[in-house]
Amino acid sequence: VVALVAVQSPSYLELRGRVTEVSKSLIPRVVIYSVDCGDVRVRFDALSKLLRLNTGDEVVITVSKEKPNYTKGVDYVAWGYVVGLRSGDRVGKVIISLWGYVVILESANTELLKLFNYMDRVYFKVSKLGT
């Protein structure tokens, strides 16, 4: 498993991982991605025309309170709000709404919950490695 928490600060989280599942949503043209980043699992949905990943692809996921540097037309970047912080069942979850699209960060390490507050405005970036 490729996993690395590269940067972790009060306003920035960067994770490296591998896409483990790509599935169709019940909503037309929406795809659900699952990414294993070791200590953190990330699940998110995106419009299929905007982001095309395959099982096995290596990605870097950034969640930041500041607009991250990105390459237009290559990286996927969206912004939204932290709408849920949950701890229970030995797993902490950060839930982010990107104007209807959802990102869920899950980790047994509940320190993840301390990085964000309810209704923080955050940017979500996905960069495919090796492109």
Feature map (PLM): residue ranges:
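Mixed-charge, low-complexity intrinsically disordered regions
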Residues: 2-81, 87-131
